[in-house]
Swiss-Prot record:
Cofactor note text: Binds 2 divalent ions per subunit.
Family of this protein: Belongs to the AdoMet synthase family.
Binding-site positions, K(+): E44
Protein name: S-adenosylmethionine synthase
Binding site for Mg(2+): D18
One GO location term (cellular component): cytoplasm
Superkingdom, natural source: Bacteria
Organism: Verminephrobacter eiseniae (strain EF01-2)
Metabolic or biological pathway: Amino-acid biosynthesis; S-adenosyl-L-methionine biosynthesis; S-adenosyl-L-methionine from L-methionine: step 1/1
Amino acid sequence: MANDFLFTSESVSEGHPDKVADQISDAILDALLRQDPRSRVAAETLTNTGLVVLAGEISTNAHVDYIQVARDTIRRIGYDDTDYGIDYKGCAVLVAYDKQSNDIAQGVDHASDDHLNTGAGDQGLMFGYACDETPELMPAPIYYAHRLVERQAQLRKDGRLPFLRPDAKSQVTLRYVDGKPHSIDTVVLSTQHHPDQSATATTMKQSFIDAVIEEIIRPVLPKEWLHDTRFLINPTGRFVTGGPQGDCGLTGRKIIVDTYGGACPHGGGAFSGKDPTKVDRSAAYAARHVAKNVVAAGLARQCQIQVAYAIGVAEPMNITVYTEGTGVIADERIAALIKQHFDLRPRGIIQMLDLLRPIYEKTAAYGHFGREEPEFTWERTDKAAALRAAAGLSPGEHHRKEG
């Protein structure tokens, strides 16, 4: 890669229409898991002006008021006024759930008498990633893009910037020198707002622009990275119509926002609305857990993990490690250590990360990774010391490539 380059990642707020859909899907998953941890769930959501459609496949012994869960989620996000295009009190909610296919269930439920050898719910490939660009071991562009829209929501909800509305998008372009973050080149922040914040049809009031820069952006970004940074605030001007009224929202359409902002490949499977027997979700969480522990152990400055599964088969097809030359031991040796220290069978993952709990709605906005809340068990670095010891490394041996 070039010595001096730019890299960009984006995020969206909890009020973005696709994120509204993700949060409803995960709120329904949580409601089911609270009553029946064995629920099999693939909950999809569509949001549009004044309308929510709930569809997918659910097999459960739980009794959940799906319509009320959807309304409560929309209210929490902040869509409580018909002027916003959707109002939790009056929107229509249509429910069209089926049961899980028996053909899938037989491969997952009866792959083995040993519950740890329960098969994967589908084929697929998943990636995990970690790097040392932030204390959370996340790529800096996506990490700070998340923090920007998270702060937008915080200041909207606590009344400090009462003219904001729920929908927002952020984008951070970071300059790298010698492979390390050097400075922030450009920040884009587009936020929905009340009509009185527009100066003209295509421009915003300067007071609005100043408030967004000083109250949202500057408190979040590292001061030492702000060298001649460009700030683009609502660059097309007026952003009054937003959320599900501005665009139809669907579950699973923000998979790069949900993961690493494009810093590593993506297997294509979305997360929200899926119970942890779906390896699209659980194995991606496990791959992040593995990669983060590898970096936390000092075995590499960055680590990409690929795992793949076949439906009905418990053991992964492969566990592949790529450290892009930053490893202190060979990638193949890191892969061998991973196999020794992590059980990446679907049931092993569920047990290792304690995933049969109602923890998922919180993951559905501001990223599934790089979060320190206790629900995010895949962010623990509890295997780092064991990995380091097994690699035979002492504290002074970081970043020495094995010959």
